[in-house]
Every structure is written in C-alpha cells, then in structure tokens.
C-alpha cells in the first residue's frame, strides 16, 4: 500500500512540474530538423507536453525522426512546405558558381523572402489555423531562430515567453534581439560572409561594405515580413521589431569557441553538439557488414567525403567534379564518398573509391582507420568530426560554412580551401597534409577535450533552461540586458554625443572666425 502511495505521489509531482510547450521549426532541412528532434525528444522524456509544427523530414536511411509519444501533438506542414522548398533550391541554382557554391553575393533579401513566403503558407495549414483560433495556453513557445516569421505565434499566445533555438550559428539579428555584441567586421563577423583571412586593406574595406549590405538586406527583409504578417493576420499585428521583444531566451547550437567567445547576456546559452549527446540513440548510427569490412581492410587509411544533404555531385560543373575524381585517384588512401544514387553515372571513378547515397557518418568517423573528413563545413558535421577526433578539410559551399572552415584553421583542426578556385593539385596537397601531419589530429583532440570540459552537457542545458523559463514565466527580467532590441543610434548615445559635438564644433568655429 505504501509503495502504491509513493508511486502515485511521484506521478503527481512529475506532472505538476510538467509544462506545455509550443514549437515551430519550419525549415525542411535534415540538418536543421535533426537538432530540433533531439531537443523535442529530450523534453518528452522529462514528461512535458508538446505541440510541434514542422515539416516531416525523411532521410535516406530512415523515416521521420520524432518518436511517437502520448504527450506529443505533431502538425505536419510538409504538404505546403516540401515542394515550395524544392522550388526555392531549384531557383537558387541559377546564381551558384561551379554548380554548387553560393557565396555571400547570393545572400539577398529577395532570396530569403521566398523562405518567409513558405512559412506564411505553413500558417495557412488547416490544423495550424485551428490551433491559432483555439483557447489553448502554453508555458513556453520555442521557435527556430533562423527566420523571423514564426515570431507571430507570440501575438496569438500573448504573455507566453519565447525561446529561439538555432540549429547552428545565431544571426546578427538574433544577437541584436538579445542585446549581445552583434556586428563587428573583424572580431564578430557576420556569419554570411565568405572572406575572413589574409585580407589586404582594400579587401578589408570591401568586407566592411559587405557587412553594411547584409545589414540593409535583412532590415528590408524584416520590413517585408512585417507587411506580410499584416496582410495575412490583420493590421493590428505588431511588426517584427516589436515581436522580438517577446523573446526571453536564445539557444545557439555552436560551441562558444566557434563564435570567438562572443560577449552575450545570460539569456543566450551556447549548446554545441546537442545531437551527439550520449542519451541520443538512432538507427542512423548502424553500420552494415560490407561497410565494416571496407573500413577494416583499409589499413593505409580512409578519407571520408560528404558535402552535406543538400549538395548533389550532379550539380557540380564538369571541372569541379573532375577535381574531386582526380584527387581521389592520386592519393594512397581509400575513399568513402557520399553521393546520391540519382546522380550522374561516374564511369571513371577510381577503384579506391566506394560510393553510396548515405553513410552512418558518426560511426564512420569514429573508426580508427579514418584519417581525414572532407566536409562542406556544416555545424553538425563539424561537431561530429571533433567528437570523433578526426581532422577536417573544409570545402565550403554556402551560408556559415565559410566561417566554420575559417575556424578550422584558426584552431588548427584542419585546413580549408577557396572552393571557387581549387584545383586537383591543391586539393591533393591539402588532403595529404591533413592526413599525414599529426598537428591537425592533435589539435582536434585538444579542442574536443577542451569544449567537453563543461559542468553540464548541451542537451541537459537546453532542457534545464527551457524549464527555467517556464518556472519563472520568462527570463528577460533577471537574465537579460537593457541593451536588447535597442537601436544602434540609441546604443551609441547619438542623442547625447551629437549635440555635444555640434556644440564643440560651433564653439571652435566661432573662435576661429573671431581671430
């Protein structure tokens, strides 16, 4: 009888601490959704109740990653998302260089406006519309930080604190929202840039202008999204800048060292490697016998090559594709190359190369014979390589990958290349250097041990702070900063400094004229 009472008491206590969480993760990208899936499942294991709006993502190995749970209500907006996103990707091919490279020149308001329209369409999904009309209440709203449109949820569920979570780096706009140091062309560069090192004075000036252009592009994008929200939901809807004031916490899924240890207030929490937590298990980590045999028999070493889930070898121009093929032909190692089966037939693939549409990446990287990881520089791939102690050769293609690869060289964990100009000779030289030079391996192991020396694992931190925001009904008051959402003119105290300068100049000018 006492045991029954104890069990019932524990059940009541657990449910009394449970919170209701509304999540919206709109980007139909496997690398994004992998992070959010791990976070959602961790909250479910804690007994919390979640409503999740997202497009279901299927990868090559297994289906949708969310585990069915009685406390989970999923609203799958894939029917209004996936084809839309495919068209966006198809349209973006026009501006790509060498068939696959999207540098900072492609980061424009027009290109990202399509993403906002896609999310606007998600809000027209019938189940989402019913949710917005309902009288449901939530303790916390958690939304993807990459885009601003989901902030509209804070208008419908008023007085509910918002947490933004990024699958990788935070944007400059995210940091402005939190009152953190957001823009500095040298120390805290915009993650959308593609040039960071070895710059001449003139090149540095050009990068400053790139920073200014990006600021103007995304400011206009915010204005466009504000107008879209008012057309969709009515003229009383606040603009994006006002909705950002409802954000109480931000999770950034990178290690602070990869953000140059940016000064941030306490309501910005860096995670980094959330999806490689020991509590996370997945069928994606399984390895078949043929692959195991290939790895075991590769006594000279293995080079693992994956340019991410959104890059297809068939999109490369013939010159770029030949650079990879000739490099693999000339190195003494065996190669695992992740290439989609629907890609063009490679009649001249060297005999030392094994091609598959998918590999269990974490297991492959942890094999003792893997010497180098040739990667596009994505955040999740970088985390997995560091966790496995494998040095990297970065071939950046888009977004924050240029910055991530720059950090490889900064911390001595690998090397990078200019994807627009690289040839087979240079690619071969760098592969051999990273494979043979122990300093890259040692640098990776050192960095891994340093970033893992923390009082709390990333996933535990994300869950704890989510519960903290729910318990305290927000976090801005005690963890935030007064600098949050402040304009640059106010932050720099122009209203005080400009009159002072004018007064000083006028006084000086009067003295000059009176002489």
UniProtKB/Swiss-Prot annotation:
GO terms for molecular function: UDP-glycosyltransferase activity. The keyword Glycosyltransferase applies. It holds the Pfam family UDPGT. Its EC number is 2.4.1.-. It is an enzyme of class 2 (transferase). It comes from the Viruses. Residues 1-31 form the signal peptide. InterPro entries: Ecdysteroid_UDP-Glc_Trfase, UDP-glycosyltransferase, UDP_glucos_trans, UDP_glycos_trans_CS. Keywords: Glycosyltransferase, Signal, Transferase. The keyword Cell membrane does not apply. Catalyzes the transfer of glucose from UDP-glucose to ecdysteroids which are insect molting hormones. Expression of egt interferes with normal insect development and block molting. Belongs to the UDP-glycosyltransferase family. PANTHER family: EG:EG0003.4 PROTEIN-RELATED (PTHR48043), FI06409P-RELATED (PTHR48043:SF145). This is Ecdysteroid UDP-glucosyltransferase. The lineage of its organism: Viruses, Viruses incertae sedis, Naldaviricetes, Lefavirales, Baculoviridae.
